[in-house]
C-alpha cells in the first residue's frame, strides 16, 4: 500500500452534514465523526490507513456517493480509526495494540452502531434494528470486512476495496486471541461448516474487490476468496485489471459500479 494522494474536486455544498465529537467509554477518549445525508440505509465509512473521519469529504468520496445520499437512499457515517496506535505501530507492544484495537471494535459495535440505528430510525420513521453497510478502502476495507464477518447480526452489507484481510499485515507473526478474532482469514478458515453465521452471510451482500496494478496487494483478496469458496460463503469477489492501482480514482469507479447492486432489493 501507499499513502493516498489528494484529489481536488469541486466541493459538494448541498448535502446535509452533521459533525459530532463525543467521549467514548470503550476508548477513554473523545472521538469525532460526521454524518452525510437525511435518510436511507446506514453506511459506515472507515478511512484508509492512518486516515481521519474527514477524509470521506476531503478526498471527495462525497461526490461519488452524492446520488444515493441526496436521494435519501443512504446516510453515511464517517468515523475515525486509531490505526497509528494499532495496526500501523508495528514497533509497538503487540499485546497492547491488539487490546486497543479490540477496544476500537467495541467502540463501533457498542457505541456507534446504536447511535447510527437511532439516527436513521428517526430520520426514516423506522423502528427496530436496521442493518448497516460497512465500507472501506485500503486498510479501511480490512476493518470493514472484519466488522462484517465478526458481527453479521449488526452489518448486512460489505463493500471492501483494495483491502488486506490478515492481521499479519499489522501484527506480523504475533498471535493471541484478540489478533485471531480480528483476522478474517484466520477465524473464517476455522469456522465450522455448519456455523450459523454462514447462513447469515448468505442472506446478505458482500463485495470484495481489488485491482492488480501498482501498489495493490491482490494476494490478500485471493487468500480470502479461497476460504470463502471452501466454506460456501457467498460473496462477489472481483479482480480488476493490471491498470487498476491502489488509488482514489479507481475507488471512485468501483463505488459507482458496485453500490447499485448493494442497494438493489432482491
What are these regions (language model features)?
Residues 2-14:
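Short, Lys/Arg-enriched N-terminal segments with co-localized hydrophobic residues
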Residues 14-266:
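Non-catalytic cap/lid and distal C-terminal segments of serine-dependent acyl enzymes
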Amino acid at each position: 500500500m501507499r499513502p493516498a494522494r489528494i484529489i481536488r474536486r469541486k466541493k459538494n455544498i448541498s448535502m446535509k452534514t452533521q459533525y459530532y465529537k463525543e467521549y467514548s467509554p470503550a476508548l477513554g477518549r473523545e472521538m469525532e465523526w460526521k454524518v452525510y445525508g437525511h435518510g436511507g440505509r446506514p453506511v459506515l465509512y472507515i478511512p484508509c490507513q492512518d486516515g481521519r473521519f474527514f477524509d470521506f469529504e476531503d478526498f471527495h468520496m462525497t461526490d461519488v456517493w452524492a446520488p444515493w445520499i441526496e436521494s435519501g437512499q443512504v446516510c453515511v457515517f464517517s468515523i475515525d480509526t486509531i490505526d497509528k496506535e494499532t495496526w500501523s505501530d508495528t514497533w509497538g507492544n503487540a499485546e497492547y495494540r491488539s487490546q486497543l484495537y479490540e477496544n476500537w471494535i467495541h467502540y463501533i459495535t457498542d457505541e456507534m452502531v446504536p447511535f447510527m440505528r437511532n439516527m436513521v430510525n428517526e430520520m426514516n420513521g423506522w423502528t427496530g434494528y436496521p442493518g448497516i453497510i460497512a465500507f472501506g478502502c485500503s486498510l479501511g476495507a480490512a476493518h470493514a470486512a472484519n466488522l462484517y464477518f465478526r458481527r453479521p447480526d449488526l452489518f448486512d452489507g460489505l463493500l471492501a476495496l483494495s483491502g488486506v484481510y490478515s492481521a499479519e499485515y499489522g501484527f506480523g507473526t504475533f498471535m493471541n486471541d484478540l489478533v485471531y478474532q480480528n483476522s478474517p482469514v484466520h477465524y473464517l478458515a476455522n469456522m465450522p461448516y455448519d456455523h450459523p453465521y454462514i447462513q447469515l452471510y448468505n442472506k446478505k451482500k458482500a463485495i470484495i474487490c481489488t485491482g492488480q496494478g501498482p501498489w495493490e496487494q491482490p494476494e490478500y483478496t485471493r487468500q480470502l476468496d479461497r476460504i470463502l469458496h471452501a466454506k460456501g460463503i457467498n460473496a462477489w469477489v472481483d479482480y480488476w485489471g493490471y491498470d487498476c492501482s491502489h488509488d482514489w480514482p479507481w475507488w471512485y469507479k468501483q463505488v459507482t459500479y458496485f453500490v447499485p447492486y448493494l442497494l438493489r432489493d432482491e
